[in-house]
Amino acid sequence: MKIMGVAKRHAIKLLRRAVGLPTGDLDIVGRLDGFENDVVHGWAHWPRQKGRRVIVDIFAGDVFVCERAADMLRDDLAANGIGDGRHGFDVKIPPAFSRGAKTRIRVRPVTDAPLELTASDERALFARRISRDDYLRATFAEAFDSERERAAPAAPQPSQKTELLFAPTPVSSPPPVLGEALCAYLDQNRYKWDLADKFDATLSIADREAFLAHYVEFYGRARRPLRIPLSARDIEFLNEGPTPQERLAPSRAMRLFAQTPGEDARDDERLAAIFRWAAFGAAAFNVEDCLIASAHEDALRHCDDADIPFPLSTFMKRFLDAHPMLRGANVARESERRAAYFAILLFAARAPHYLRFVPADWLAAYLSPRAGAAPFEDESRRLFGAGGVTIARWRAAIDALGYDDEAKRFRTRTPSGHRAHSAALPAPAGETVDIQLIGPFSRQLGIADSCRALAAALQQLDYSVRLCDFTLDYPNRIRADAVPLPTSPARAKINILHLNLEELPSAIAYLPDIWSQGRLVGFPYLEMPTPHPAQMLGLALVDELWSASDFTTQALAGHRPCHTVGTSARPARRRGRGAARARVYEDIAGADDFVFLASCDALSGAFRKNPLGTIRAFLAAFPNDAKVKLVIKTHSVDRVRAERETNVWRSIRNIVAECERVLLIDRILDDDEQMALIEGADCYVSLHRAEGFGYHMLEAMALETPVIATAYSGNMGFCDEQTAFLIPYRLIPVGPGEYPRTRGDQLWAEPDFTAAVDAMRAVFGDRDLRERKVAAARVIAETQFSTEAFARRLDARIEDILSRRR
């Protein structure tokens, strides 16, 4: 970690002082480390001012985004002797300001000379001095955009679905010991992210604290700028600490997430810590809307000199003093106090919770015209000229951030006191359609293909249909041919959430609350014969379930009404085996080679998809035949993180390196290439241990490619002895690390090795048998799994639902 040399910095400082130029920027060291996934990372430090944190202003282009204290602990800073290591910052750039990777990020430490952090730590030889007014003009000149900050329509009242997120968890467990049971959403989060063995909030208060600390710090920061769900009890628990006798005692949230003074600290030290948390710390954790204790709000709102016009509260005074460009004002003068109000209201346009610390009556007076313009508008014209910030545009800015200025609170709080992001979202505009389909349309994964198949079938029917792209928690790559779709739904008579059950609660938590007037249908895939605790809340939230296979229906029927509606294969454009092979196999297989193909998304699980088992069977079936090859098609191996999974892929790469008849394709193919890959193979192999449905097997049947498949799970809706070479199996326990959120009682199939070897040899050697199965399979694919057949099944179920509304 290289920073500008002390000698060079000192020489520049002496030169500037000699000619009367500012030197404040030379007292700061720091760097902009990078900008990735809309998060800006960096650090800034004042070596000569121990314990003081640098304040940084973050810009996207020329637009001010927010102000933060550089106070995040970074181990690399501590290891390199950079102060106490608490000098980092990371800020999520909200979508309203972001242009993705094209966003030009600027980070300016607040000092009396212009300074912008870069990848180096160099300083200019000369610098101009800036005044308070210059600073405010430069910071807020482009901050108010009428389009970006248009006032939002009122949010609807939270529905019963939203309230269910905060109900008792549907997962049965022993009664609490000394701790408390988590609400449904937080408990589901614990199971979803494989934290159940690490955290049990029911055991003790300390255990409850530990989970909530992890939830807010890691899950909450990852979700920024979305507001993660917190129950009213969670909020009360985290705000506990201050009492009528000790109103300045730190809250539990402060103790968990911030630096707090010791028990023998003076009141001024405690108040300073409360101010730092309220001004910067809570916002850094995205909890400023709910985790500032009410006793602390009262203390920060207090005015020592309440009898004078436009008095400054404790918060306002400390904010001015903490801010290098605002401190030093002569607040004994009313004009300076009015200017201070204006400065703080400008910052409140990016941090609306500041308004809770401004005296309410005087804030109203500042925004109200008396014998002319309001004081706000007077100060705006003085600072920005005739085209300055209007009160209407300022109100629109705070409204866009979900703050209700009349109620003096954020709209994220429900009438029950819970915190829900959906509660702050505006009521959706547009007509009520018959059917709304919500799912990860734009992603490169199986359920996205299923979304498109479902959409195609629905659009054949005589109903109004709206499609909505929902990709939260789907890290898969974006399809190159993805069609832009709305990401925010509106109202519908039937809402279909085509998501995995463990992802479904996130749709309720983070989408507008549109669920109260329509029927909510979940359309999940299930790979295990019983649902996992992470999937139980998803089941509780829906009114009914649709499934593509009887396997899923049987697994879920005891939890919600479940209807098998099936699905459809993508329309097959047959080009002939020779042309298909030339399209994608040109460099790896000749025209007269016999090619077995197995495929899987590496993020779908190497143990579940079992490519290594396929390789074992292939090499046992054909140990030496140079004209028989196996192609393993995958993608995203570089994104696999689980150790046991990476070990499997490392072993596969080793085999590929040592055996020229086993080939690996690790890249995303477009739909045309994928179809050619399947059609150009002589046999498609799926020795899976569990399968939600098995689209590639069905597509192989439609393309007249023989199929070898494990006789278990979702594919059995179209695989039988007439259509496929079925491999018998035995049920075995799912091993640790072999499947997400593995439980000891979960079972899946272990395909019979000898049968798999025999099936490969049969496909290769018995042409008549191969062709009989291919012909039968094609009939099934075209008659039962066409878009038209799928549409007919859907129509029957939809008509039944809508007829009950009439």
Q: Model segments located where?
A:
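Extended catalytic core of nucleotide-activated donor transferases of GT-like folds
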Residues: 107, 324-326, 330-331, 415-427, ...
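Conserved catalytic-core segment of nucleotide-activated headgroup transferases in glycan assembly
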Residues: 449-457, 465, 573-674, 679-680
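A short alpha->beta transition loop at the rim of the catalytic pocket in nucleotide-sugar-dependent
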Residues: 682, 704-706, 711
